[in-house]
Amino acid sequence: MFNSGRVRRNGFQDSQMDTIQQRLAQAAEARTFEKEGDVRLVGAMNLTDEQAKKLPFALYRNGFFYYFRTHAHPNSTFLYTQSSLMDLMNWDVDDRMAMIHQPLLMIAGDVSDTRYMTDDAFKKATGTKDKELYLVKGAQHIETYWVPKYVNEEAAKLQEFFGKYLKK
């Protein structure tokens, strides 16, 4: 799972906690510029393949090649307005996990550097007793999207889980 609000707010693996106020100030400033017609866009990774291979987190290394090279949509820019960071930082997938009262299956790669977000959300899903965290052995986050052996394993798990809990 990828909690985009948490990452926009705290940085990946909570690595930018000390710059939250600075980034909010930049978003507020961007909103002022938008009033004058100057929209500031952020988000694209202008990297060479060699630079991408050196990124510190597997999510970003794998994500660069998946989203920018092998599976990129021709119309995607990967950009968003800097002012929207205020809203993006405010949203958090974990906030209402306790309200889930239906069967819940969460799937994550067991070696994924995003797993901390899945683990945190799963712990907060206290509204259902029918829940399971399924770990895909050897998988990183992005690999769970497209690597056939992982996708097939996930599809089988989805069939098993929802076959058990969904009424026919």
Predicted regions and their residues:
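Conserved alpha/beta-hydrolase "acid-adjacent" motif
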Residues: 89, 108-119
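Short, conserved loop/helix-junction motifs that constitute active-site signature segments
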Residues: 97-101, 124-128
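Short beta-strand/loop motif that positions the catalytic acidic residue
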Residues: 100, 106-108
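Catalytic histidine neighborhood in serine/cysteine hydrolases
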Residues: 126-142
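Catalytic histidine-centered segment of alpha/beta-hydrolase-like enzymes
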Residues: 139-152
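Active-site nucleophile elbow and catalytic-triad environment of alpha/beta-hydrolase enzymes
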Residues: 9, 14-15, 78-96, 102
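C-terminal alpha-helix
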Residues: 157-168
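Alpha/beta-hydrolase-fold enzymes
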Residues: 1-68
